Every structure is written in structure tokens, then in C-alpha cells.
Amino acid sequence: VNMFLSSVLVKTVVCGRQYIPKEGPYIVAINHFHIFDPALVAYSIRKPISFLAASDQEIEWYVVLAGKLYGFIPTNRTHLAPSTIKKALQALTRGDILGIFPEATSGFALRKPKKGVTYLSIKSACKILPVGVIGLDDIWNNWFRGVRPKVSVRIGKPFSVPEKFPPDRNKREKMLSDIGNDIMCHIAALLPESRHGDYAGNQKIGYYKD
């Protein structure tokens, strides 16, 4: 399915495959602009990925089907339950690849990440592979017009985050916020400026660009 969508229905251009680790475990952190983002990422990484997928909203049948095909761990976007964290950590302990959308919702431009996903990134002590996907916005209109849209998937250099939380609660909250924003800046560096959203003008983005 990933191959059919990414190489037949759309023209997918992938940059940065040299940065993909040879083996897991690691976390793939992706912007979320469209429901087909997981398919494009799975095609680009070319390895099995378990995605954290929203379970707290009504979704279309084809999204449910896609989730079953990709492999997904259901999660509540407003509260990352202990059972979800446990399943995600178990997957990483097995050496699997975990796909996360830090914003936990789709939109036109980048938004602030949810703390639960940031917490998981720290708790797992795994490297994070940032990925930016762009070009799916008008996919339905293009298909109806008989146009095969061009989609860009950019893969950045993997990076690490601190592995321990400070005992002080205020410092812990600040750490979650800072690391979450840092993850988003790595993703923003792979996207055009018009999509930087809440991170527009952030100086870290230029530092993280190739």
C-alpha cells in the first residue's frame, strides 16, 4: 500500500536517506499535515514502523485501515496513558522503530508539541530521526483533475535528548517544554518557512538546517 501510494499515485522525492540508522530502536518524529503522512514516511524509511495514532476521535474508515496496515499504537492525544507509554517502550525495547507526531493533531503549519510525546522521547533514551513531509495538501483535488502530485519527504540527522528528568517539578516541566520545542525546530528545519507556524523566526531552525 505504501509503495502504491508513494510511487504510483504520487511522485515522492526523498532526501536524506543516508541519515537513517541501520537498525532500531529509534523514534521518527514527523510533522502532521495530512492523514497520508504515515504512508509516505513508511515508504521513505523502508522499514516497519509502529505509529502512535489518535484513538480519542472519530476517524474515517480508510484511516483506520491505514493504521492497521502500518501498525499503530492507539493513544489519547490529550493524555498519554501509562498503558500507551508501556506499549511504546516495549516496542523500542524490542528494537522496533516508533513513529510519532509530536503535535498530536494535523494542521497547515507546525504547532506546539504535546508533553506526553516529549516525555516518551526522554523516557525511551532513543535517538530521534526528524522527518518533514510536504505536498499532500491538495492531493484529492489533484487526483480528481488527473494530476499526479509531487510530494517531498526530507529526512534530517538523528539527534539525542537528555535521558533523565530533574527531581524538581518546575525544572521538569521546563525540560519537557524545551525539549519538545527543540524537536519541533529539528522538524521545521526540513520544511519551507511558510509552514513553520508557531516556530516562525526561531533561530534554532537555521542552526539545524544542512
Walk through the language-model features, giving the residues of each.
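Short, basic, glycine/proline-bearing loop/turn elements
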Residues: 1-2, 69-75, 101-105
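N-terminal membrane-anchoring alpha-helices
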Residues: 1-13, 204-207
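Catalytic core of membrane glycerolipid acyltransferases/transacylases, capturing the structured
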Residues: 7-8, 15, 20-79, 87, ...
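A conditional alpha-helix N-cap/helix-loop micro-motif detector
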Residues: 10, 78-82, 110, 169
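Residue-level preference for the first positions of well-ordered beta-strands
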Residues: 25-27, 95-101, 129
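Catalytic-site beta-strand/loop segments enriched in glycine and acidic/polar residues
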Residues: 89-118
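A cross-family acyltransferase "interaction/gating" segment
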Residues: 108-174, 178, 204-207
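Short, highly charged C-terminal tails/helix-capping segments
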Residues: 195-210
